[in-house]
Amino acid sequence: MAQLTLKNIKKSFGQTEVLKDISLEVNDGEFISLVGQSGCGKSTLLRIIAGLESPDTGEILIEGKSVTNRAPKERNVAMVFQDYALYPHMSVAENLSMPLIMARLPLHARLPFLRFVAPAARRDRPVIAAGVEKVAKQLRIGHLLDRRPAQLSGGQRQRVALGRALVRDPKIFLMDEPLSNLDAKLRVQVRSEITELHETSGLTFVYVTHDQVEAMTMSDKVALMQTGELLQVGAPNELYANPANLDVARFIGSPEINIVSADPGVGLKLGNVNLPAHLQDVVAGDLKIGIRPESITVQNMPGLAFANAPDNSPTLAFNKRLVEDLGPELLIHGTFEFEPETPIRIRAQKNS
């Protein structure tokens, strides 16, 4: 395990500022997800941690020691790429063994025709084989060791890529959109396998994704990025329940949170309903209120039956436009009567 610290990381490509003064702390054995839209800088930040890119300014520390100017091989981190990056002409066993072989060879012996005959590789074959066997057992891919990547499914190739990173016994595990090439069903399966791998290995994981579901379900901590900045860092439920701003509130949660206008007045007035609220810190001007789709209870909607709302709940008139049947629940689209130009989404459980 290892603690990772990023201090004031900045990075630009030409005139484009990609990372804007990023500081982040990842504790020993923690699983943190860097999440955000494409182009927010999360993959660049991961590559800087790995040593594949250099920051313009700032410092990277692993276990309290600066690795900012160290080569990737000197950082003892392992990275899993989106495209797996497996050697197509090698078996699974050979793919898994390559990091162990290369780590034992001097630079001049790393040419393809020399690596398997170099003394270090021959001498350590039993150790290398034991490492491959251990990882294959851990990831349940022992029956695939003689196959080549072209003979594997997408999920199997992903497990081999994980194994090739894990076999090095790294301090930190870096993953860049590892599930993006898998279909929806397989993503759920491999997602749970990665979570299990984190729990059993105890390693520090830094995981890049644009998928908030992956980030929320797998992580101890989520770092939400936007245009090169960290908007909020915290436990998944902290970002969901206490978003730092509207951008965080809109990104976290599915369907997206409803944002409507409100009048501070006395307490808080939403349409014709007065809501209890503490607004001492609210300044004069426009006020927005966020309402999660799953926090709205639907009643008296023709053709639909729902559980009763809690007593004394505020009631707002709603105009239904579309209902999507998702099996155990419904996604209802429409508008509140007091603000008909703002689309509203309601996620409602069916009344069984």
Residue ranges of each PLM-predicted region?
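Non-catalytic connector elements of ABC transporters
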Residues: 267-352
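Conserved coupling/switch loops of ABC nucleotide-binding domains, chiefly the family-specific signature
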Residues: 56-59, 227
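ABC ATPase nucleotide-binding domains
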Residues: 86, 91-247
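Conserved ABC transporter NBD signature motif
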Residues: 58-66
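Helix-to-loop junction immediately C-terminal to a conserved catalytic motif
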Residues: 50
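The feature captures the beta-strand-to-loop junction immediately N-terminal to the Walker
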Residues: 35-37
